[in-house]
Regions:
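Short, solvent-exposed coil/turn linker segments
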Residues: 101-105, 231, 295
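Protease-domain processing segments flanking chymotrypsin-fold serine proteases, especially trypsin-like
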Residues: 1-134, 264-269
Length: 320
């Protein structure tokens, strides 16, 4: 009889398994399940008793992967609690839903307010179909960093320089960065993008990066500090940016994690997953969506930039 090969865990299951390795996370999730905190949604495809019983055991990653197979809502709850996407108000991110995670974050909350304020939403004026297109953040002088694929929506190369694109009516598309755009906060902090200085070539060996020049003024937030050392696996990080609704993703899981609130500044904590050999990027497990393109990946301990988020797959792997 031919021996069947064991099923390989999906990226979603591997992500959940990684999260459940964190100190105290498994026990706290089991406690929440035992208290019935998940029982009000019947579509979890697992009863609260089943979830609590499973999480209360010390099992292998393979057992976790098997348990969460096809249990989309069970998986979404693990990510909702342990990889939340926290709202930001006046530069301060909300309290995390898990006590252990909140304990790790709260001692850095005040210090992280400054770098959080230096991340903004890139907005478009006179674009044919879009009001905004991604995230950008300030570095030294009057420079804004974003992704190549974001900048290419409003700018293009012309010889050795770059110019703003024209819309269908022949009018130049203009761009600005708003460092606020927070949930239910009416204030704005808008600054005009004067020039596009550089867009990386669209080749695999080049980073997905672009450099913009903002009109310099005294009211600009302080520049972010770039980390001097490479990130390390399992280093605590957070993606700061503006996740947008993405119709390509599972609507139910997306609503569970993002709370049906999009287009505003969010703080998404997580960890560095890996640093591929000889690559210019890292992978992380923070919860992100399309509008996060161009987001800053910040070290939670020091607030320095360890990466530029440029892509990934919802509930799977992200790149920076």
């Amino acid at each position: 009889m031919r021996k069947r090969n064991p099923r390989r865990a999906t990226p979603e299951e591997l992500r959940v398994c990684s999260v459940l390795k964190e100190k105290g996370t498994r026990e706290e999730l089991a406690h929440l399940a035992a208290r019935g905190e998940w029982s009000n949604v019947p579509a979890y495809n697992a009863s609260r008793e089943q979830i609590a019983d499973h999480l209360g055991k010390s099992v292998s990653p393979e057992s976790d992967a098997s348990f969460f197979d096809s249990r989309r809502f069970s998986e979404a709850i693990v990510l909702l609690k342990s990889r939340p996407v926290l709202l930001v108000k006046n530069g301060i991110f909300d309290e995390a839903p898990l006590a252990g995670l909140e304990q790790r974050l709260k001692k850095h909350r005040a210090a992280l307010a400054t770098p959080i304020r230096s991340v903004g939403r890139l907005e478009l004026i006179d674009h044919d179909s879009m009001d905004w297109c991604g995230t950008g953040w300030r570095i030294e002088d009057d420079l804004i960093v974003t992704n190549r694929h974001v900048a290419s929506l409003f700018a293009e190369r012309q010889g050795s320089l770059f110019r703003f694109r024209l819309n269908q009516a022949g009018k130049q598309v203009r761009t600005r960065v708003d460092f606020r755009e927070e949930y239910r906060q009416p204030e704005s902090d808008e600054h005009v993008i004067a020039r596009v200085l550089w867009i990386a070539p669209d080749v695999s060996e080049a980073p997905d990066m672009a450099i913009l020049q903002v009109v310099k003024g005294d009211l600009l937030p302080p520049p972010l500090v770039l980390a001097r050392q490479d990130a390390e696996p399992r280093q605590a990080v957070a993606v700061v940016g503006y996740p947008a609704r993405d119709s390509r993703n599972d609507a139910g899981a997306m609503e569970d994690i993002f709370g049906n609130i999009y287009d505003v500044k969010r703080f998404a904590p997580g960890e560095v997953v890996g640093l591929p050999h000889d690559a210019w990027y890292l992978t992380h497990d923070c919860s992100t969506l399309g509008g996060n393109s161009g987001s800053a990946v910040l070290s939670i301990d020091g607030g320095e930039v360890v990466g530029l988020h440029f892509g990934g797959q919802f509930r799977k792997t992200n790149y920076g």
